[in-house]
């Protein structure tokens, strides 16, 4: 069978999902799980964009031993230098350099002629090649670029030393036959004295990212880019787990295999969903809760007689266990640590002590603590510790019909407490009014969403909030058994994110 490379951009393009911002530790943990899953290449970040991204890419480069690490760069020498410095200690460093090629980008964003663009490609790809053995070039918005000019751009990049050409459907504009034809034309017309790998990077604006990626494979692409669970800006990226299982289940048609360990797929999906704070839709292909459920009586009858009547793959193939051994109030530190390890978390001993205390609190309230509860526990702890303040106490009191009084005490990382009291038409409004008095930043609540982490009346609640301050949007996530406490935690994190943003602008936080 032929082999195709899997290029994961969860930590770069995936993190551009509105409301998603991975911490340093979360990025490192995800990178380790991606390597365990078996991806060939990880796009660890955009080093020139921020010190945080640079540090994360550097740490990932120094940690991974089997997976190539890529840094993204614009066609600018300073960007390329930043990638070099961040990835120079990687075992397999790669550079991904890009510049837009479509008429609308040339005219309105870059203010360049086609000739100037080709000169820019030559200059920066050749500079990148002087620092890296492997250079990938992407003509941004390739699918809205005239095909003849796209061939010129790619030929120019190949002549300058690029050995990987990535074709991005940046705005999810293309459809399978058109996208596949782009690869066919490029492979037939671009000449090279060295081997060139063609890669596909699709967005899901029209719901065609996976279909377009498969069409690219059918027309010669040997590298596919995407993100776990298909996360990414706007409608998201190609869902890598869907491509992987599509190739495996229909290997009779494609004749192509990946290096992915398919039984690590569900664990990888759950880990990313937990850190991103985005629940996987129940009907999501491959990893959704309903992916292996059968509701129809006819389907159930057939499935019970022979599973293959209505299942083209087994839950075990993607790592879904037929039975789960839940933790309980009698579970000790060792069992809890082992569960964290099973779920893909690489957590310091100090943090494990903190998490174990919270776990015991949950176990006292629930008969069984499921894997989803543990994911929620880690996620909630991560969001709380990343916030500038933590919720110390929360008290509510009925004042009169429709009016509640809330007393909130927040604590900063140095242990200083900030009390506040307020009233409001309802408990949530009262709590948020009290928090507003502490942060002193008038905000507008744009979205408030509450979901149950698990089934049952004893389930933990996850609250996602979206607020606007000074015209900018901030997000927060809170997890707790108590809905009001989860709501308060989410609102505090969103306001903390605004505080951190303001500090960065003032030069306080790098």
Swiss-Prot record:
Pathway the protein contributes to: Amino-acid biosynthesis; L-leucine biosynthesis; L-leucine from 3-methyl-2-oxobutanoate: step 1/4
GO cellular component, one term: cytoplasm
Matching InterPro entries: 2-IPM_HCS-like, 2-isopropylmalate_synth_dimer, Aldolase_TIM, LeuA/HCS_post-cat, LeuA_allosteric_dom_sf, LeuA_bact_synth, PYR_CT
Domain spans labelled Pyruvate carboxyltransferase: 4-266
Oligomer and partners: Homodimer.
UniProt record, GO biological process: L-leucine biosynthetic process
Assigned keywords, A-Z: Amino-acid biosynthesis, Branched-chain amino acid biosynthesis, Cytoplasm, Leucine biosynthesis, Manganese, Metal-binding, Transferase
Compartment(s): Cytoplasm
The name this protein goes by in its record: 2-isopropylmalate synthase
Annotated segments matching region Regulatory domain: 390-510
